[in-house]
Amino acid sequence: MILHTMSFYNLSKEMGLALNDILGKACSYNKDFSSEDIAITWINYKSENKRVFKGFGTGINNKKMVYPASIVKLVYGLAAYHWIKKGILLLSDELIEAVWKMLSLSSNNATSFLIDLLTGTTSGPCIEGELWENWKYQRSIINDWLHDLRWEELSGINCCQKTWDDGPFGREKEFYGYDNKNRNAMNSDSAARILEEIMIHIDYQKNDLNLRGFLKRNLNKVFLKNDSLNQIDGFLGEGLPKSINLWSKAGLMSEVRHDSAWWTNSQSLHTLLVVFCNGEKYSKDTSFLPLIAKEVYEFNERYTIED
């Protein structure tokens, strides 16, 4: 188990000790669970603000690269926001609907459409020669943009692939590379930094692409019961009181179960929590993430943030 601090938050020793205990407790309920499979970034904020270094937090295995599944859609949403601000893309009803469906409903079809717009590439059969080289160059535009942001915590991440129900095929499969070496890859700190940007560093105007609004979750039990893909049940949101305000984006496939969440507790303390669970056994488990969130929330009810 490796603990790290990153530049966008201040390290809290108290939270670090608490997280160690929380993760140990959560893993103790299943003999097959190991802290080495889990990556966590946890940050507390006094209030919403636009200043870096405001949050206090901690992390475990938070530099470890894993397949992010649908967590990567946070990156694509932020890219769309910046493309629009730069005038590269025009804001339209269709674009708004695509980003909403990608973030709120986790639609892979919407994600595919958006990546086509962001990169000027399309899926299809394999191509060769100059066409193929140009295609790969274009598809890497999002990674180039991430690099140009010069955020230390984004170093080494790979966000250039579409998300699939039953793919990839053709040029998309070839772009994955030998042994899937070019699959998307993120760590919990990079996901946390992207979510922090969406939640507190963007000053949304009336006609902006409101990414934050697309991540808002409904915790009403009746609503959740009628939506089997609600990104709450089996994820962090399930472990939180139903009365809180929650924004989140989950990621789930046969190999992983992840979640990234932002909420406010009764003391107006803002919490950002990203948990990556890597392995088929976690993908099938629906109790681990809610337990982590419950323990973090209860700690925060007693927690006094440093000045």
Name each model-derived stretch:
Residues 82-101, 111, 205-207:
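Short, well-structured active-site flanking segments
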Residues 76-83, 114, 191-198:
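Buried hydrophobic packing segments
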Residues 32-65, 81, 85:
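Short, conserved catalytic-motif segment at the N-terminal edge
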Residues 3, 7-37, 94-189, 197:
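Active-site-adjacent helix/loop patches that line small-molecule binding or acyl-intermediate pockets
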Residues 46-48, 67, 109-110, 120-121, ...:
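Solvent-exposed loop/turn segments at secondary-structure junctions
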Residues 60-68, 99, 180:
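A short glycine/serine-rich beta->alpha loop
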Residues 2-23, 32-37, 183, 192-307:
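Structured C-terminal helix/loop/strand segments within mature extracytoplasmic catalytic/sensor domains
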Residues 66-89, 102, 273:
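Active-site SXXK
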